[in-house]
Amino acid sequence: MSKVFITCALPYANGPTHLGHLRSTYIPADIYARYRRLRGDDVLFVCATDEHGTPIAVKAEAEGRTPLEVATRYHEMIRGDLERCDISFDSFTRTTDELHHEIAQKFFLKLYEKGFIYEKDIKQLYCGDCQRFLPDRYVEGTCPYCGSEGARGDHCEGCGRHLEPLQLEDPRCMVCGSEPEVRDSRHYFFRLNQFQDEIREWIEGSEMPSNVRNYAIQWLREGLKDWILTRDMEWGVQVPLEGNEGKIIYVWGEAFLGYISSAAAWSKKTGRDWREYWDSGAIHFIGKDIIYHHAIFWPALLMAYGCRTPANIIAGEYLSLEGQKMSTSKNWVVWTSDFLERFDRDLLRYYLTVNAPLTRDTDFSWDDFQRRVNDELADVLGNFLHRTFSFTGRFFDGRVPAAGELTAEDLEFLESIRAAHDTVAELLDKFQFRDALMHIIKLAKRGNKYFNDQEPWKAVKESPARASTCLHLCNLLAANLGKLLRPFMPSAAGRILSIMNLEDEAWGFHELREGQVIERAKPLFSKITDEAIEEEKAKLIEEDDEVETVTIDDFTTMDIRVGVIRSAERIEGSDKLLKLIIDVGEREMQVVAGLAEKYSPEDLVERKITVLVNLKPAKLFGVKSEGMVLATGESLNILDPGDAEVGERIR
């Protein structure tokens, strides 16, 4: 029996969960935790709500509440969402807990004492009326990229770009509306650059999935820069050094430790040592938007402290909605609680698992959800189980009949049942959740074919022994389907095992004794009606109708052309921005693009792109930008113009 430490990325407590959160992080992590428990491993599965940072503080001021009141409200919502989805945490705590503050401050102090944290002055926006510095979302203004008003100090909803407060044009304090000034502020930095070689060696020697490994190596190629570790605000974990009143540890300097504080809280309750689990190798489940933090920054902090680094990092890619990027601000999203008001949690766990491999972006479509539930769960899995149980009840008095002499076809069918647990286990060990679940569905499909080929409705009259053997093997498959589905669809699996009067045993092939009582059962899965799907789609359309439209004249003012990147380099002081020299046919232009998290400069040189060439020039980090490179989605995939000639206008 091995000890296993499994974590989920901490959900941020400024809103409830939506399907994107569940798909990328919580459902796959729970599948893996349940699987390892069934294998007999000693699992510690932890999480917490991340309750510090500017978004919560800003929301609290806007609502006339304290940040703790806002965080508490959403902590309870998030906890409820995850419990209703059968996420089986051993510990789910909060970063506002006293224990978390204590652990985070001790961690900070040790790094400071070891010389890995130093002080440096930086320039920040300061509101004279409020008499405070304005980090992140405490400031808004005009986006320098797309010109959208109301862009926040960390993000523009208009174009999706990451921003820094000093980049905003016409910045305003979010609280009082006054224009801030630029002042120097002293902050603490972590010597991330010092761990460049150690991080590279760790990543290259790890078993991380390619999407995590490649992303991290791309950053390492560019060289790591020291990381600011503090913020000027009151809400958060206070810097534990004298003379630093009003300074907190940056959320990415303490939120990681929510894994540790949640485990430590579990230790206090159980009397068991969480360190034994951590030292066995932690497995982090996260969304791909925080790969950098977990694959670069977090292991460097652990190396500096002297702790073991994670054993693996599993990053789920993005989920879009009906072909469009999800947006909570525009309500283009399916909230977990809304989904569960109408549909069963197992349908959610099933669809978000089989929709696509975890390492690939995918889309949630109501039509596809209906199709897969109806075709795969109702018509394949549910149909096989219902036929087997009903036939057993009708012709064998509700008891598993004896198996007679086995034919070659019977033996082949039996072997597929015997091998299933090993096949699914091998896939789950590789974190291939979709393939593992689809193997189970294919096994149920094979069961339907076997049932049809054997024609037990005829055999029960013409050859009772043949019908008895067929139903014995079909019940054997049903029992093992129930066992196999436990990590993926625990509620449905429990119903199958209950119908068959079976115990929740360890992972592995399950023999079935003759005479086992099979209870009368209704179909496990009902088909989803067209009306139900149309109602859900209508909710999105109602919201979409509010989107502001533009005329063809508006569109024709935009000069979008095919270009080719002649040179690319990083911009000093920014982790997101690249300076590009782009050939657009008649001339070369300089563009600052927020592509550094996705692409290295070397990857972009001589690459054809589409670029908006008549954008009003702006300065970003002191570098002039004359246009905008077009890319899609949160993943910032550059639009490929194909065979179009450089300089051609896109119409």
UniProtKB/Swiss-Prot annotation:
Binds 1 zinc ion per subunit. ATP binds at residue 328. It catalyses: tRNA(Met) + L-methionine + ATP = L-methionyl-tRNA(Met) + AMP + diphosphate. InterPro entries: Anticodon_Met, Met-tRNA-synth_bsu_C, Met-tRNA_ligase_1, Met-tRNA_synth, Methionyl/Leucyl_tRNA_Synth, MetRS_core, MetRS_Zn, NA-bd_OB-fold. Disulfide bonds: none annotated. Its EC number is 6.1.1.10. HAMAP family: Met_tRNA_synth_type1. Residues 554-651 form the tRNA-binding domain. It is an enzyme of class 6 (ligase). A motif ('KMSKS' region) lies at residues 325-329. It is found in: Cytoplasm. Belongs to the class-I aminoacyl-tRNA synthetase family. MetG type 1 subfamily. This is Methionine--tRNA ligase. Homodimer. GO terms for cellular component: aminoacyl-tRNA synthetase multienzyme complex; cytosol. Its main location: cytoplasm. GO terms for biological process: methionyl-tRNA aminoacylation. PANTHER family: METHIONINE--TRNA LIGASE, METHIONINE--TRNA LIGASE, CYTOPLASMIC. Zn(2+) binds at residues 143, 146, 156, 159. Its cofactor is Zn(2+). A motif ('HIGH' region) lies at residues 11-21. Keywords: Aminoacyl-tRNA synthetase, ATP-binding, Cytoplasm, Ligase, Metal-binding, Nucleotide-binding, Protein biosynthesis, RNA-binding, tRNA-binding, Zinc. The lineage of its organism: Archaea, Methanobacteriati, Methanobacteriota, Methanomada group, Methanobacteria. It comes from the Archaea.
